[in-house]
Amino acid sequence: VSLTVPALHVNWTGPHRAGLRRHRDRVLENGPYGMPVEEILTCVHSAHAWRAFHGGVELVTDELGASYAAAQGLDALYDRIDTALDALDALDVDPLFYFAAGKSYAARLRAAPFAVVDTDLYLRRPVDGLERGGFVFAHWESVGNAVYPPVPEVPNQAGLDLSRWTFDTPAANMAVSVFLDDRHRAEYAEASMAFMTGNAGPSDTAPIVRQTFAEQRIAPAVARSLGVDLRPVTERFWIVETEEWDGPSYADRFHHTWNQKRLLRQFPELRPAYWRYLLEDLLWRFPGTGDLLLSVPALKECADLVRAVRRDLAAHGPSLIERSTP
C-alpha cells in the first residue's frame, strides 16, 4: 500500500504577466494566458495518477491561474484551489529569473508530508519508499557547468549566507519533490525565497543559473546539513554538459515532457504526434478522463484526436505506449 501524501500543482502566472513565455528559452509572447495542449494533457494525467497512487491534489496559483482553470474546467481536477501566489507580486522576486518561484513559495504554506509535482510530469507507478521519510526528488543532474556553476560563482546579490549548508551533491531535479521532513521543508523554503529576493542584478552567468540554484542546489544542500535522507525517484542521471542521460530508463516510473519542449518549439509539426502519445497513455490508464478532455475549450483543436484515440483503444488497445520511453 502506497503512503498517503497530498500533492500540489503550482501555477504562478507571474512570468506570463511579465511578458515571458513559460519555457526555458525565454521567448517573449503576447496574448492571453494559456497552457499549451500538451501541458493540459500531462496536467490531467498528473492529477489523476497522483490521486490513484498517493492521495489528494490541490492547485496553488494566483487569481489569473484560478480563473483560467475554472474557464477550462480544469478546476474539477483539484480538491482545493488556493490563490496564495498573488502575494508573490509584492515581493522583490523577479519572474524573469525565477519563473518557478511559486513552487518555493508554496513550500512555505504547507507542513510535511506533501509533494510538489510539475504539471508536465505524471507518474506511471507509485513513488517507492516514502515511508522512509526524508526528501525525495525526480533525479540527479551534474554540476560544475553553465547551468550549475560552482557555488562561489552563483549570483548572490542579497548576500545570503550559503556557508550554512552542505553543497556536496549533484543537483536534484525537482519536477517531483516530496517533502517528508518538516525541518527540511521549512528551512529549504525560507532559504530558497531568501536567495531569490533582491537577487536579480546583472551577472555573467546564464539566466537559468539563479532559478536552478534556488531550488535544485539549495534543497539537497539543506537536507545534507540537517542529516535528512535524500534520494531520487530514479537512478537515471542527467548529464548537463552533453545533454545526455546515463543509467536505467525511468519510463516505467514517470513521464516528463520537459526535455521534449525545445523539440516541440523547434519542430511544431511534431506536436500532434506527441499529443497522440499522451492521449493514448492517459486514456488507456484513466479512460474516464475522455469526457473532461472533450469539454476543455483549449483542447478543441485535438477533440477529433481524442475521439479517434478512444475508438482505437477500444478496438485494439494501445499501439504506442508499450514500446515508448520518455
Sequence positions of predicted segments:
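Catalytic core and acceptor-binding pocket of nucleotide-sugar-dependent glycosyltransferases
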Residues: 166-263
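A conserved donor-nucleotide-binding helix/loop in the catalytic core
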Residues: 37-40, 44-45, 87-117
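A short acidic (Asp/Glu
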Residues: 20, 68-72, 126-128, 218-222, ...
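Short glycine/proline-enriched coil/turn segments at helix->beta-strand junctions
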Residues: 52-56, 107-114, 131-134
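Conserved donor-nucleotide/metal-binding helix-loop-beta segment in metal-dependent transferases, i.e.
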Residues: 124-156
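Hydrophobic/aromatic residue at the end of a short beta strand that borders the catalytic acidic motif
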Residues: 117, 123-124
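N-terminal anchoring/stem segment of glycosyltransferases
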Residues: 1-90, 260-269, 274-325
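Short, flexible, basic/aromatic active-site loop/helix in glycosyltransferases
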Residues: 155-167
